[in-house]
Curated annotation (Swiss-Prot):
Membership in a protein family: Belongs to the eukaryotic ribosomal protein eL42 family.
Origin organism lineage: Eukaryota, Viridiplantae, Chlorophyta, core chlorophytes, Chlorophyceae
One cellular-component annotation, GO: ribonucleoprotein complex
Protein name (Swiss-Prot/TrEMBL): Large ribosomal subunit protein eL42
Pfam families tied to this protein: Ribosomal_L44
GO aspect biological process, one term: response to cycloheximide
Span of the signal peptide: none
Species in which this protein is naturally found: Chlamydomonas reinhardtii
């Protein structure tokens, strides 16, 4: 279980010093319909003949690498930071209590 605080002090390239950053999890954007590969694929798929390219089935990984998107609260500049793989990820969860 990885628990990351909602705000974090980190170096900002815009301000050129350590600032408070707002932390969110990076999500992949929607794939464009007009990218060259998608246009080529759609052209090949159209007409008779069924599936033209192999459909990938051999999934090897069970987790994804976590990417944090950090935004400076002063200048709004963003930067990404990659983390290791983990099954459970949480932003701003309760802290673990010590003994």
């Amino acid at each position: 279980m990885v628990n990351v605080p909602k705000t974090k002090r980190a170096f900002c390239k815009g301000c050129k010093k350590h600032m408070m950053m707002k932390v969110t999890q990076y999500k992949t954007g929607k794939a464009s319909l007009y990218a060259q590969g998608k246009r080529r694929y759609d052209r090949k798929q159209s007409g008779y003949g069924g599936q033209t390219k192999p459909v990938f089935h051999k999934k090897a990984k069970t987790t994804k690498k976590i990417v944090l998107r950090m935004q400076c609260q002063e200048c709004k500049q963003t930067c990404m930071k990659g983390l290791k793989r983990c099954k459970h990820f949480e932003i701003g969860g309760d802290k673990k209590k010590g003994n």
